[in-house]
Every structure is written in structure tokens, then in C-alpha cells.
Amino acid sequence: MPRYAQLVMGPAGSGKSTYCSTMVQHCEALNRSVQVVNLDPAAEHFNYPVMADIRELIEVDDVMEDESLRFGPNGGLVFCMEYFANNFDWLENCLGHVEDDYILFDCPGQIELYTHLPVMKQLVQQLEQWEFRVCGVFLVDSQFMVESFKFISGILAALSAMVSLEIPQVNIMTKMDLLSKKAKKEIEKFLDPDMYSLIDDSTGDLRSQKFKKLTKAVCGLVDDYSMVRFLPYDQSDEESMNIVLQHIDFAIQYGEDLEFKEPREHEEESSSMFDEYFQERQNE
């Protein structure tokens, strides 16, 4: 039977560890067993238990302190991830061979790992050899995405990971619970955007004709092929988390091969209502 994996990606500070923590709690409430693997060798702390931690294999601080290497923070991280890619047997031993595994991989935030280096692609290929169905989950801070220019930048970051890894990908705006009501109204247009209206918003202040043409080309590409769409993620709202989980499950076909399991005693049936996030907030 297949196993399932989410590669949780996104820039530093986008909420990857918080996403893993809240998603694990949400899945536990649904009687689903989900484990987390930390793949960030520079992580300092996280508030969830992990089944494997790359820092047990190699840690950035140790690499930076090695006089024979003389790496800085970014070089140290790249060295750690390349070392990890050469030692996938360590990860295999940590994961074991349990069927129906559902694992969240908390990945580093440096974009060069997805655009310039083969490490993450090699990880995906290795997981697929271990019979994992893999979905990329790309996070972007919603507070960063409230302007057209920044939104287009976020689209390009998400596209770079999507093109590099060649796996199903769900793009998420995190920290929706931190936005004001006014900001939520503003950001709603970016969840399923009209790219041609964004072109007008983005190019109005541009003096360079080259940048105007580039912006129009990017927006046209995204709109013509429907390549990027963002889902809102509000950790204080169960319905928002349900919608995100449903999209990911659909991408990796979770549940199609699972055997039926009786719910635990005194456990209420989970709601199957997956209304859109903003529908109930229109009157707020």
C-alpha cells in the first residue's frame, strides 16, 4: 500500500513549523496518524514531536565551526543538505517500512535548494522509490502578499519549486489569523486572482518598459495556464484547515487504498462540510 508525504516548503518565516504543528493536531482530531520529520539542519526549536531530526545526522553550527570547511550560514546549510542527500539510508532507517504512513517533511526555507541544487529533487525521487505519494506544500506569509508586486514575487517563488520538483503542489497563504478584517478583504482578490487586473495595478508605477513587459508576461503565463492558486490557512479556524487538507489529500489520492477503521469510542464524527473560507465572513 502507498505511503504519503507532504514537503512543507516556503521562505524563512512563512510559518512552516507552525503549519506542521497545527496540522498534526488537526489530523489527530480526525483520528489520522501524522508524523513530522525535521529537514532543517539550522532549526533551533519546534513545538511538536518528530520521528526524525536531520540535526541528529548533521547540524549547521557544527559545520560552521569546522576550521577545515570555513562555511558561512548559507554555505553550511548547502553542505548539510548535500551530506543528507548522500546519506538517505539514515532517513530510510528512521522512517521504517510501516504502511499507510503520512509524514510531513519540514524543509529549510532557502530558495536555492529548489532552484540551483538537486537535493530536494533527489529527495522526492527517493521517497517515490519508497512508495510515497508526495505533494509539495508551498507556504507564503499572507502579510507579505497584500501588494501586487509582492504577490507576483510569491508566485515566482512557488513556480520555481513546482517546476524544479515536478510533483503536485498546493500553495498556501499562512497567518490569516493575524490579518485585520480590512486586510482579509484586500487579500481575498489574491486567492483566485484576475491576473490582468493585477497587471494594471503592478505596472502603473513602473518607469522601465522592460519591467512592464516582463510583469505582463509573467501574469499572462500564470493566467493562461492556471498554474498558481493560493488557499488561505487560518490556524484558528478548523474549516480553513479542513479545506487545505482536502486539497492536499486529493492531490496525493489519500484514502483510496486505505482500509476502513472504526472510530475510537466517545469520538464524534468529523464534519465533512468544506465550504469556502470567506463565504461565512462576507457579513463581518
UniProtKB/Swiss-Prot annotation:
Motif (Gly-Pro-Asn (GPN)-loop): 72-74
MF terms in GO: GTP binding; hydrolase activity
CDD domains given in the database record: GPN3
Superkingdom of origin: Eukaryota
InterPro entries: Gpn, Gpn3, P-loop_NTPase
UniProtKB keywords: GTP-binding, Hydrolase, Nucleotide-binding
GO cellular component: protein-containing complex
Region (Disordered): 262-284
Residues at the site labelled Stabilizes the phosphate intermediate: N74
Described function: Small GTPase required for proper localization of RNA polymerase II (RNAPII). May act at an RNAP assembly step prior to nuclear import.
PANTHER family: GPN-LOOP GTPASE 3 (PTHR21231:SF7), XPA-BINDING PROTEIN 1-RELATED (PTHR21231)
Protein family (similarity comment): Belongs to the GPN-loop GTPase family.
Name the record gives this protein: GPN-loop GTPase 3
Native source species: Mus musculus
